[in-house]
A protein has these predicted regions:
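Alpha/beta-hydrolase active-site loop
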Residues: 1-17
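Catalytic histidine neighborhood in serine/cysteine hydrolases
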Residues: 90-106
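Gly/Ala-rich beta-loop-alpha elbow adjacent to hydrolase catalytic centers
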Residues: 25-34
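Acidic catalytic loop of the alpha/beta-hydrolase fold
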Residues: 74-79, 105-106
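Catalytic histidine-centered segment of alpha/beta-hydrolase-like enzymes
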Residues: 103-115
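Active-site nucleophile loop of the alpha/beta-hydrolase fold
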Residues: 48-57, 73, 103
Length: 130
């Protein structure tokens, strides 16, 4: 399935570029896959955009041991904003959360802000990510 595909890509990238520091990112369903893959891959950083908390992410999750950004719109019509906020704050060391006020699930008209927030987060992280 998708998790196995993600793990295979990570293994391939590490071998291809001889690089241990991988950054994982995913949007919606991809955020759930990236979060699950992080437990095996041990990324240098993780970005989850509109993670499907309460839909696909329903069980307790171990917090990845890396810098982690959660991006969420507060008008998401598919993923409940309050549920995501509670989930994020439930971790002993909560991930960084970027809220885009007024943004819906697909961030229509807000992709520039989304991009800027992710780039700012990654600029604070380890050098050498792939």
């Amino acid at each position: 399935g998708e998790l196995e595909d993600a793990l295979a890509v990570c293994a391939w990238a590490r071998q291809r570029w001889n690089c241990e520091a991988l950054w994982l990112a995913g949007f919606s369903f991809g955020a759930a896959i990236a979060l699950e893959a992080a437990a095996t891959v041990g990324p240098a950083a993780l970005v989850t955009v509109a993670p499907p908390v309460g839909r696909l992410i329903v069980t307790p999750v171990l917090r990845p041991d890396c810098p982690w950004l959660v991006v969420q719109g507060d008008r998401d019509e598919l993923v409940d904003f309050a549920t995501v906020r509670r989930w994020v704050s439930g971790f002993d060391a909560p991930p960084q959360m970027l809220v885009l006020p007024g943004a819906e699930h697909f961030f229509h008209g807000r992709l520039g802000e989304l991009r800027a927030g992710v780039l700012e987060f990654l600029a604070q992280g380890p050098v050498g990510g792939l």
